[in-house]
Each structure stands twice: as C-alpha cells, then as structure tokens.
Amino acid sequence: MGLELYLDLLSQPSRAVYIFAKKNGIPFQTRTVDILKGQHMSEQFSQVNCLNKVPVLKDGSFVLTESTAILIYLSSKYQVADHWYPADLQARAQVHEYLGWHADNIRGTFGVLLWTKVLGPLIGVQVPQEKVERNRDRMVLVLQQLEDKFLRDRAFLVGQQVTLADLMSLEELMQPVALGYNLFEGRPQLTAWRERVEAFLGAELCQEAHSTILSILGQAAKKMLPVPPPEVHASMQLRIARIP
C-alpha cells in the first residue's frame, strides 16, 4: 500500500498537508474523513488514529498524526526543494521557532469563527458574544505579533523563500476569511505576503484546497450541511466550552 493521507479540507492542517503534497508532486491516496458527518469518531478511523483527529499520514505500517511532523516527514522522504525545510541549521531553527509560536498562538485562535458561525449552530449551541469579541481582540493582537516578530520587512515568514511556516500560517488565516472576517483588510504588508504565498502555490491549487471552507457559510445559510450525529455532540460541546 502506498502513501495514504487521511484528510478533511475543512481542517486547516489537512489543507496544509494536501497543498504541500500536491505542490511537490508527492503521490498519495486521499482518505476523506468527513468531520461534519462524525467519521473521525468512527471505529474504523479510531483504529488509524485513536486521537480522532485529521490529518493522518499512513505510509505502510508507519503512522503520523500531527501535521507538522507529517510535513517534515514528507519533506525529508521525498527530498523536496530545500527552501521548504532548510538544511541550514539557523534557517531550520527559525522554521521551528515559528511553528512553536504558531501552535501556541495561531492554532486554536483563528478557527473559533467556524465554531461560532457554523459548527455550534449545527448542534444548537450559541457561543456567548463576549467570547466572540474576546476572540476577535485576540486575533488582532496575534496578527500584529505575526507581522512584528516574523514577517517584518521580509518576503516570507522565515526569510526570502516559502517555508513550511508560510504554508501552515496561510491555512489558519484563511479560516476566518472564509467565515466573513477579512483579517487582511488594513494590513498591506500581510496582504502582500498572502499574495506572494498564493502566487507561489498557484491559483488553481489554492482554489482546489480552499473551495470547501470558502463555501461553508453559503451552505450553512441554505441548510445544506449535514447535521453531526448525536454521538459526536458531546465532544463538540466540550470544544465550544473551551473557547476562552
């Protein structure tokens, strides 16, 4: 069995892995895991990843369940262009520096709107307005940190070429944009960075990867989304309760 990637393109890390593999011509089989239908909680998927999360990489009997580890593994195994995950010690350390900050600040912050506007209402849960406003303030703060600490006057987050850092960041920032919050507005430096990253990746690949999330609000308004099965409601409610 060749390389298998378990993905749901509603998921930011899934999109990052998908785009990376496609952009670099890495052969793989897509195993779609539809989160809205609760497929991530199925017994079948639990045998692949007992954490019940996507993305997952399965390479024969070898399994990885964290997106950063998956991207690094693919970079090394398929010997992709050095700029993605530089061999230079200091450049690589800077990629890891960003990814560590990303996990603590970007990840979890920019996905909240999906829960407040789509996932919560699907199961009849309303996120308190004060949490929504707090999240908006947090996004503004983190975006400023992203510009001041990482982007600065550079073309990309770690120097003058695209790295794994840019890909992971772009996919997180696309989440609120797709849900009606244009966080790039009034941020010309960040907007120019996004345009450079998307130009490098290619418009067709970006559209393919982003089509699911970009259509989510329209589908929700037309009540075209599947209602998650009752057995996943408890885990969804817990996730919503954890929104700071």
Swiss-Prot record:
The keyword Metal-binding does not apply. It comes from Mus musculus. This is Glutathione S-transferase theta-2. One of its GO terms (biological process) is glutathione metabolic process. Gene3D superfamilies: 1.20.1050.10, Glutaredoxin. Pfam families: GST_C, GST_N. Belongs to the GST superfamily. Theta family. PANTHER family: GLUTATHIONE S-TRANSFERASE THETA-2-RELATED, PTHR43917. It is found in: Cytoplasm, Cytosol; Nucleus.
